[in-house]
Regions:
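Active-site lining segments that contact anionic ligands and/or coordinate catalytic metals
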Residues: 73, 103-105, 118
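Short coil/turn motifs at beta-sheet boundaries
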Residues: 4, 22, 58-60, 99-101, ...
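C-terminal beta-signal and adjacent terminal beta-strands/loops
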Residues: 81-89, 97-99, 108-154
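Outer-membrane beta-barrel domain signature
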Residues: 1-2, 50-56, 93-97, 135-139
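Generic alpha-helical secondary structure signal
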Residues: 35-37, 91, 137
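Gram-negative outer-membrane beta-barrel transporters
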Residues: 1-87, 129
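Hydrophobic, lipid-facing positions within transmembrane beta-strands of outer-membrane proteins
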Residues: 7-13, 61-65, 102-108, 144-150
């Protein structure tokens, strides 16, 4: 891999609303389309060429989105990540293809103030749909997991 030609588009948006006095809704998302091709001149002595193939681990399409609700009592959020199919090596052949994947996660966060000590408690559910997927070939990502965090600030 020596030269790469990348063309594409990124679109990002966000919106924050406060429909009621103590409730805020935050929405955001982004979309990427990129055509990232290996344009290194092919070596005539090499049988296998990657010329004009999408470069490894670079999906043509990816997207993410977030939605959150902030209240005086608790903050809730949802996030979504999508990555289109991509290839583990420079040759865009079936053996190197990695399927597209999506990941959904949710979280809840609550802050407490006791005298001069602020405590935050959060719970997250990662990979909510418990989908099996690989970001890197032969290295599967964990299934559904729950993470709880307590932070104390004084």
């Amino acid at each position: 891999l020596g030269e790469v030609d990348i063309k594409g588009i990124d679109a990002t948006g966000s919106l924050s609303l406060q429909p009621w006095d103590k409730i805020r809704i935050n929405l955001s998302g982004n979309y990427t389309y990129q055509r990232a091709l290996d344009v290194t001149p092919p070596d005539p002595n090499t049988y296998e060429s990657t010329y004009k193939h999408q470069i490894a681990y670079t999906p043509r399409v990816s997207a993410s989105g977030q939605a959150g609700i902030e209240t005086a009592w608790i903050d809730l959020s949802y996030s979504f990540l999508f990555s289109g199919k991509r290839y583990a090596l420079g040759q865009n052949i079936a053996e190197n293809r990695l399927d597209s994947y999506s990941d959904h996660s949710i979280s809840a966060n609550r802050d407490f103030q006791i005298r001069k000590i602020t405590t935050s408690f959060s719970v997250e559910v990662l990979n909510l749909m418990d989908k099996n997927y690989e970001i890197v070939k032969y290295f599967p990502m964990p299934g559904r997991s729950v993470r709880a965090t307590i932070k104390i600030r004084y």
